């Protein structure tokens, strides 16, 4: 009985997710790929990032900036809350000059977790600008992917005022989402 209940709950969960957007093409295989498997992969990637990948795990932990932005832009219709959470984490992982930290753990920017002693090869979670990698070590396109992710989120949710929200930078200070996006474009 518990197994049947759990199975039915799981089925209902995915029915709800997949029911938010349905694409119809003349090819049933394409329909299944787009409406089921692509959405499933996107949801799983956004929920657990790519931590499960042996390629990504190799001694590193955290969110890959580009991967996370690309994953987030695929789910605002099916999981707007998680999409916004990832976008806000990426905004926190942006340096005021406009480049993203290529790999970072969102927990670094949570006050209660700043003093856990973890030493990252990418960034040390302190507000000292000289402790964060400089633009010469930045991947120029990482943060650019956040722009369409925010656009897709706003188009889907209608939360236009999201661009006015103040969000901290990784290297200290804060600015609105709009100013973060402008910094990204100016850097690139």
Go through each PLM region and give its residues.
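Aromatic-rich carbohydrate-recognition surfaces in CAZymes
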Residues: 63, 68, 72-83, 87-188
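Acidic/polar, glycine-enriched structural segments that form the non-catalytic walls/loops
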Residues: 1-62, 161-178, 182-185
């Amino acid at each position: 009985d518990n197994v049947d209940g759990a199975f039915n709950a799981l089925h209902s969960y995915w029915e709800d997710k997949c029911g938010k957007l349905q694409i119809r093409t003349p090819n049933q295989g394409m329909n299944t790929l787009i409406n089921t498997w692509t959405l499933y992969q996107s949801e799983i990637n956004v929920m657990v990032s790519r931590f499960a990948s042996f390629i990504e795990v190799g001694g590193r932990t955290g969110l890959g900036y580009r991967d996370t932005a690309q994953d987030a832009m695929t789910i605002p219709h099916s999981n707007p809350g998680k999409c916004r959470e990832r976008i806000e984490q990426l905004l926190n992982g942006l340096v005021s000059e406009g480049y993203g930290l290529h790999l970072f753990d969102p927990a670094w920017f949570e006050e209660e977790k700043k003093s856990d002693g973890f030493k990252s090869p990418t960034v040390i979670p302190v507000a000292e600008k000289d402790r964060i990698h400089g633009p010469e070590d930045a991947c120029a396109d990482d943060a650019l992917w956040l722009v369409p992710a925010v656009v897709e989120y706003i188009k889907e949710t209608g939360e236009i005022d999201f661009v006015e929200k103040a969000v901290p930078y990784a290297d200290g200070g804060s600015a609105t989402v709009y100013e973060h996006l402008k910094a990204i474009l100016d850097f690139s």
